[in-house]
Swiss-Prot record:
GO terms for biological process: nucleobase-containing small molecule interconversion; purine nucleoside catabolic process; pyrimidine nucleobase metabolic process. This is Pyrimidine-specific ribonucleoside hydrolase RihA. GO terms for molecular function: purine nucleosidase activity; uridine nucleosidase activity. The gene is rihA. It comes from the Bacteria. It comes from Escherichia coli O139:H28 (strain E24377A / ETEC).
Length: 311
């Protein structure tokens, strides 16, 4: 039986590819997709979800837009990475359908309520919508199997020296998620920076030759440009968000550890930092499964294999 999932995202090139991977995988049953502000403004990320589902001919999936700003802060976006539209590069179709007439939290709650079994929430943007859901619907916590997030890092940040972008945008929301008591799986920069897509991988995807694989290659063409900056030391572009879906499909590709994680919400230099108690120094019980390594070639092979679904 397919695993029911609810995807909360802020497309974003890597979010878009996570959607592609999830919907090409019969092991997963995508019940709904909600959008969060982050990689671009809330209006643009919602539109990008609709554009991607139109491309994939999955206009049957309920979609709703989420919070327009973080819980306690002003919104920061990553337009320097993802461009003016949030999905610059390919020519994507205009949305062929409309979002639900409700908020992201309302759609999430409805999805959980109606599911016969607990649902896995996959969150690849800031954690605002998920935190609002947890705070407003404590009665539904038991309907959440786990929360798989792309965010954080044990070491270096990518938005500040200490913080990864998704967590930095709304650290208060991330702290609510980590301390919720619900199992959390964290795909942070420690693993996503190893999940790099090289130019030759992009060409491999393009050569698959269907409309979706071509769009994915064109998304990566744009995404690779930002990551060519020598400061990163990358060979390719880290494909952050699809690591969450890949872990659900093939956990054997990833090395994980069980650790306690907290989020710094007030630090002068460390705001948004995920504090991972790697050496068990706090005495706190582990609250997260933290990804620390990935079989890069296996990850690329999985993407290539699933892109053939769209032939």
């Amino acid at each position: 039986m397919a695993l029911p999932i609810l995807l909360d995202c802020d497309p974003g090139h890597d979010d878009a590819i996570a959607i592609v991977l999830a919907l090409a995988s019969p092991e997963l049953d995508v019940k709904a997709i909600t959008s969060s502000a982050g990689n671009q403004t809330p209006e643009k990320t919602l539109r990008n979800v609709l554009r991607m589902l139109t491309l994939l001919n999955r206009t049957d999936i309920p979609v709703a837009g989420g919070a327009v700003k973080p819980l306690m802060r002003e919104l920061i976006i990553a337009d320097n990475v993802h461009g003016e539209s949030g999905l610059d590069g390919p020519a994507l179709p205009e949305p062929a359908f409309a979002p639900q007439n409700c908020t992201a939290v309302e759609l999430m709650a409805k999805t959980l309520r109606e599911s016969a079994e607990p649902v896995t929430i996959v969150s690849t943007g800031p954690q605002t919508n998920v935190a609002l859901l947890l705070n407003s619907h404590p009665e539904l916590h038991s309907k959440i199997a786990r929360i798989v997030i792309m965010g954080g890092a044990m070491g270096l940040g990518n938005w500040t020296p200490a913080a990864e972008f998704n967590i930095y945008v709304d650290p208060e929301a991330a702290e609510i998620v980590f301390q919720s008591g619900i199992p959390v799986v964290m795909a942070g920069l420690d693993v996503t920076h190893k999940a790099q897509i090289h130019v030759e991988d992009t060409e491999r995807f393009r050569a698959i030759g269907n409309p979706v694989s071509t769009i994915v290659a064109e998304l990566l063409d744009f995404f690779l440009e930002y990551h060519k900056d020598e400061k990163w030391g990358f060979v390719g572009a880290p494909l952050h968000d699809p690591c969450t879906i890949a872990w659900l499909l093939k956990p054997e590709l990833f090395t994980t550890v069980e650790r306690w994680v907290g989020v710094e919400t007030q630090g002068k230099y460390t705001q948004g930092m995920t504090v991972v108690d790697y050496y068990y120094l706090t005495g706190n019980k582990p609250n997260a499964t933290v990804m620390v390594d990935v079989d890069r070639q296996g990850f690329v092979d999985l993407l290539a294999d699933r892109l053939k679904f769209y032939a």
